[in-house]
Amino acid sequence: MAAPVVGDADLQSVRRIRLDVSGMSCAACASRVETKLNKIPGVRASVNFATRVATIDAVGMAADELCGVVEKAGYHAAPHTETTVLDKRTKDPDGAHARRLLRRLLVAAVLFVPLADLSTLFAIVPSARVPGWGYILTALAAPVVTWAAWPFHSVALRNARHRTTSMETLISVGIVAATAWSLSSVFGDQPPREGSGIWRAILNSDSIYLEVAAGVTVFVLAGRYFEARAKSKAGSALRALAELGAKNVAVLLPDGAELVIPASELKKRQRFVTRPGETIAADGVVVDGSAAIDMSAMTGEAKPVRAYPAASVVGGTVVMDGRLVIEATAVGADTQFAAMVRLVEQAQTQKARAQRLADHIAGVFVPVVFVIAGLAGAAWLVSGAGADRAFSVTLGVLVIACPCALGLATPTAMMVASGRGAQLGIFIKGYRALETIRSIDTVVFDKTGTLTVGQLAVSTVTMAGSGTSERDREEVLGLAAAVESASEHAMAAAIVAASPDPGPVNGFVAVAGCGVSGEVGGHHVEVGKPSWITRTTPCHDAALVSARLDGESRGETVVFVSVDGVVRAALTIADTLKDSAAAAVAALRSRGLRTILLTGDNRAAADAVAAQVGIDSAVADMLPEGKVDVIQRLREEGHTVAMVGDGINDGPALVGADLGLAIGRGTDVALGAADIILVRDDLNTVPQALDLARATMRTIRMNMIWAFGYNVAAIPIAAAGLLNPLIAGAAMAFSSFFVVSNSLRLRNFGAQ
């Protein structure tokens, strides 16, 4: 049934509500809850079986009302608690569930081994049946089919009360039917047994299915245990990320004293102290102190970053040395750290189109299986087979037809991929990215802040005449830096940064729009526009003239340095390319992708950057809206476009592309516009992110092919009487185990 669409007129009143749903045991349960919720007018719901979270867009309904709807469907629900920082006491629900299942599994397995051995012996060699053999088998089977299998029976009973079915219904009915038939055979009138042998035992187990009932319980418990453990491992990366948050923070009081409070109580604009080895509690600005900060947990970047006063810092990172006084600019759920955790959680609760199809199939699958099982048993009876043979076929169909693998195919892969991506600094916001990635053929780059560092630097120093020695170069740079150290111009900072130890300047003079001058070490030094420097003494030095023409043709800034009235050097100042730019572009081209540069710079500058990094083509003089037009034109030409931007002024282009990747620190614009957030300021994460998305889609497709193929092939085989119910139970458990194990391979993505 299609979910009611919330109209545009109602957008202002639409509330997004997330519920934690417990009691779901398979994809059919999730489909049932989703259907119940979507029957409510003005509600659009999506229920994820793997994460047990219902995401609901509702008009005019409160969370408790929606919880009531879920309760009426036979499950439990409570408003989802947004957690950004987990303390050590936080429990892992999947891990706890796995431990409970393990206790039942161990008891069941210990009893199943002698039960299977004795059952096989008594079936193959009837003469070995000692007096009371039926009681022995019953005593061994009873704890398994009752206590160990109780999780299945309890859900089946609840389903029966609500007139619904689920995977547990199939399992419980199979176990109960096999047990009842076996007890009837053991303690009822037994026909004389003709012949013996292993093949006869495998085909019908001598009409006694206690080992089948116990075996199905063991195999299904094992499958559920490994499934729960895999889901726990899949979420471990997210839990580890969340646990990085500071638990306590030392707030700096007005009198200089420090007060330690829980990090959750920190307020915006409060100042706090962070010492070596401590985690920064919130996003903020350094007010006092200097320290190296370990960003690896947040960005995957191994190299520490040095923070000085006025530098921005990110919560969740660790101070390695020094003491920092930080003023909080974002706290709690507003921090970048919290936003990244939410991104992973939201990605894990979304559904791909393939998963919606799988959930729909699972929702109707169980009733269909009962019909097929009944028809198969009836057909065998009509064909002249005995009741025990017909029952064996019916039981085999019920046991083998588990749709659990179908329901786990996509969510488990997404959970593992999003967790691994978080460890690498790659945050996939949802399935849109995964479903688009396989058809990407064009990657478009912004320049400033994406291919470049977004900060001016001296790129070349050209000396005049015979002054080509390194000593002459350092001397001129030092003189220029000394004069510029008194200036506040952006170009000045680049020149000062190029000289390690500029000297003092006297008589500093700044001429607006032209340059600066001053006395340094007894020399009169001028730094500025070539036209201003040569206003009285023309420069005819070929090297300097050539450097000026080359730099200006590339859209770079060229300044001359004059010492005592003689032009000594030309400094070319430009936005520096990132070290990773060329390698990242080469990696993309090696994957057969076309690369394009979009920039607001002039044609010469755009072509120069494109040539330096190996980009196929460049489009210059672009305003933000012009970038959107270019991307739209590429899409109209049949290309599938990925846009890589810094997320600040590239928001429209990131949204307009088929796939948006925001690289950098994850600004609000980036988080809202991009499909993939690359926290590390390293362009090599672009091909890595594309590879992760492709690997995830390959895993999902493999899981879906297996899950669909298994059910399509297994049911006819069981209906044909070619599978003993015990083997059917093992095959069903292996199906789910294969899916979760295949998904867990993504945990090793990118490991070198």
Curated annotation (Swiss-Prot):
A metal cation binds at C26, C29. Its main location: membrane. It is an enzyme of class 7 (translocase). The active site is at D446 (4-aspartylphosphate intermediate). InterPro entries: ATPase_P-typ_cyto_dom_N (IPR023299), ATPase_P-typ_P_site (IPR018303), ATPase_P-typ_TM_dom_sf (IPR023298), ATPase_P-typ_transduc_dom_A_sf (IPR008250), Cation-trans_P-type_ATPase_A/B (IPR000579), HAD-like_sf (IPR036412), HAD_sf (IPR023214), Heavy-metal-associated_CS (IPR017969). It is found in: Cell membrane. GO terms for biological process: copper ion homeostasis. Keywords: ATP-binding, Cell membrane, Magnesium, Membrane, Metal-binding, Nucleotide-binding, Phosphoprotein, Translocase, Transmembrane, Transmembrane helix. GO terms for cellular component: plasma membrane. It comes from the Bacteria. Its EC number is 7.2.2.-. Pfam families: E1-E2_ATPase (PF00122), HMA (PF00403), Hydrolase (PF00702). Gene3D superfamilies: 3.30.70.100, Calcium-transporting ATPase, cytoplasmic domain N, Calcium-transporting ATPase, cytoplasmic transduction domain A, HAD superfamily/HAD-like. The chain crosses the membrane at residues 105-125, 132-152, 167-187, 201-221, 361-381, 390-410, 491-511, 714-734. Residues 15-78 form the HMA domain. It catalyses: ATP + H2O = ADP + phosphate + H(+). One of its GO terms (molecular function) is P-type divalent copper transporter activity. CDD domains: HMA. It is a multi-pass membrane protein. Belongs to the cation transport ATPase (P-type) (TC 3.A.3) family. Type IB subfamily. This is Cation-transporting P-type ATPase B.
